[in-house]
Design a protein with these regions (language model features):
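A mid-to-C-terminal "edge-of-domain" accessory segment
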Residues: 1-36, 295-479, 515-518
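N-terminal capping/small domains of soluble enzymes
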Residues: 1-108, 372, 377-380, 384, ...
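Short, small-residue-enriched loops and turns at beta-alpha junctions
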Residues: 39, 43, 73-77, 131-133, ...
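Short beta-alpha connecting loops at secondary-structure transitions
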Residues: 134, 211-213, 241, 269-277, ...
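Catalytic alpha/beta core domains of metabolic enzymes, predominantly
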Residues: 218-352
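Positively charged, aromatic-enriched nucleic acid-contacting surfaces
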Residues: 463-469, 511-535
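Mixed-charge, glycine-accented linear interaction segment located at domain edges/termini
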Residues: 531-561
Length: 561
């Protein structure tokens, strides 16, 4: 066995007594802050240009995001110019706050204040690294030295902010102890409390304390313990808004955010579809729609997810995965036969019950809620079952196959998928249905027919059938009587070497509406010689002709064997 795992130091959980967060429930949306234009953009192979950033920015506004981190204006001239364009170009609605990021360094802070001049609502977000590893490996400083970096920056920011605030700018502050996950909790409390004091935070003018999982290095429940401990110990908790900034290195970004909200956080910084450094930031779409499925309004609009996804892929040049929650191409698709059958039954239940609640197995959300369609839900491959093909025929083409017919047609479709070794389209399934049941015109074909109905003295109906049939090259006439058109036709053909078939089942329905409506009939016959059963299907605009064609379809299928 590879012993490489021995070089890693296990995460040491924060000890906490009487934790309460597991008993909490998310009942309202957090404050959302998009960091797509900073964290997301810096992680792209080809960062967005100005026009792409503007398109992305306006999409975030349409979604309903009220706090948007637009960049790091002191980092480069490009970032600075984008900030100025957003402000001077009138792109920022009055109810939207832009957020700018800056390191806790004097010259960068001063440049940032130049960049935000003229803006109405601004969050100035500054940070420095506080973790044990960063102090030891990067900064070679003790806790006191790291704290001084943060408080010196806080003093400068507070001083420079006062003239802008007096001129009418709604300027708020945010501080991040970067690498919070790797910081001793008591020290994290101390440095954040010091920053709150130097920024003169009050319950009326709260400071955002953003506690990032800069690199995700523990389980989500362990992070929640840390967060609850931090909130308990922070002296000026009422002067702070606790914000989360999860990354996804362990694949637990969404869980970390959700448990963090349970533990006391009120705000989340996230990106669309989880774009960001390494494995990405927490996905705003997944987090918001998870709340939606629990009956909580996320206060974000993802009702046209495909439009949002198209914008994202165009601007970032990054694909959204087929299995991406809520947005991927295949997330509302079922290949498994048992899943298809359950979805079909759930759909029928919803129609019949008129329930106000979403109760369809294997679909945690109504696809229509994100602007998706029902049609592609069930897909057919070699793993699909009897119900899937029938579902496709009903929902794509209007054929409501009798339940007893599902296994037979499902097997026909499965033979095809096994042969081609891949998924087959609804159109191909429809072709197979017609080839097997509808377009079966040999050896028997009905050329002409007529009915005459009479009523006896007791009010009983009697129907007489006359018709011309063709059997290979032979044309012959038949006639028969019965208590209805189907019975009369069946009696008429019994004398033509078809007496061995007995009638078992019949159903019909319309598949189109209006004066030009078309009907379909399903007939099940039994061959008395060997007991085998055969389904037949007939289509016609004539309500009396469809079942006759279905009977001949069943007989022709029997003769074909």
């Amino acid at each position: 066995m590879n012993p490489g795992y021995t070089k890693y130091i296990p995460f040491q959980p924060q000890k906490i007594e009487g934790r309460t967060w597991p008993d909490h429930v998310i009942t309202k949306a957090p404050v959302w802050c998009s960091v797509d234009l900073r964290d997301g953009n810096q992680a792209l192979v080809d960062p967005m240009n100005l026009q792409e950033k503007l398109e992305y920015f306006h999409t975030l506004i349409d979604i309903g995001v009220k706090e948007i981190e637009i960049g790091f204006p002191s980092a480069s001239e490009t970032e600075y110019e984008i900030c100025r364009e957003l402000i001077e170009g009138g792109h920022i609605p009055d109810d939207v706050t832009i957020q700018v990021l800056v390191q806790a360094r004097e010259h960068l802070i001063k440049k940032t204040f130049e960049a935000i001049k003229g803006a109405k609502n601004v969050i100035l977000h500054f940070y420095n690294s506080t973790s044990t590893l960063q102090r030891k490996v990067v900064f070679h400083m003790d806790m006191e030295g790291i704290t001084k970096i943060a408080t010196d920056a806080a003093d400068l920011i507070y001083e420079m902010s006062q003239p802008m605030i007096q001129e009418g700018m709604n300027l708020r502050f945010e501080y991040s102890p970067e690498s919070f996950m790797g910081t001793e909790m008591d020290y994290a409390v101390d440095i954040c409390q010091a920053v709150l004091e130097h920024l003169h935070a009050t319950p009326e003018n709260k400071v955002i304390l953003n506690l990032p999982t800069t690199v995700e290095n523990c389980m989500p429940n362990q992070f929640a313990d840390m967060l609850e401990y931090f909130c308990r110990k922070l002296p000026s908790r009422d002067c702070a808004i606790i914000s989360l900034h999860p990354h996804n290195d362990r694949g637990c970004g969404v869980a970390t955010a959700e448990m963090g909200l349970l533990a006391g956080a009120e705000r989340v910084e996230a990106t669309l579809f989880g774009n960001g450094e390494r494995t990405g930031n927490v996905d705003m779409v997944t987090l918001a729609m998870n709340m939606w499925t629990q009956g909580v309004d996320p206060e974000l609009d993802f009702s046209n997810i495909n439009k949002i996804k198209d914008m994202y892929e165009r601007c970032t040049k990054m694909p959204v995965g087929d299995r991406q929650p809520y947005a991927g191409k295949l997330v509302f698709t079922a290949f498994s036969g048992s899943h298809q059958d359950a979805i079909n039954k759930g759909t029928q239940y919803m129609k019949e019950s008129g329930s106000d609640f979403w109760e369809i197995p294997y679909l945690p959300i109504d696809p229509a809620d994100v602007g998706r369609e029902y049609e592609p839900i069930i897909r057919i491959n070699s793993q699909s079952g009897k119900g899937g093909a029938a579902y496709i025929m009903e929902h794509n083409f209007g054929f409501d196959l009798p339940k007893a017919m599902h296994p037979e047609f499902g097997h026909i479709v499965q033979v095809e998928t096994d042969a081609v070794g891949k998924e087959i389209t609804p159109e191909r399934i429809n072709e197979l249905f017609h080839q097997e049941y509808v377009d079966v015109k040999e050896p028997y074909k009905l050329l002409k027919h007529a009915f005459q109905e009479s009523v006896d003295n007791e009010g009983h109906s009697h129907v007489t059938f006359w018709g011309t049939l063709q059997h290979t090259d032979t044309i012959f006439k038949v006639s028969g009587e019965g208590n209805g058109p189907i019975d009369a036709f069946f009696n008429a053909i019994k004398g033509e070497k078809m007496a061995r078939f007995s009638f078992l089942d019949y159903s019909s329905h319309a598949i189109t509406d209006g004066s030009d409506s078309q009907g379909v009939a399903y007939i099940l016959l039994k061959d008395q010689r060997d007991g085998k059963e055969y389904w037949g299907v007939g289509l016609s605009h004539n309500i009396n002709l469809a079942p006759l064609r279905a009977i001949l379809s069943a007989i022709n299928r029997a003769k074909r064997e």
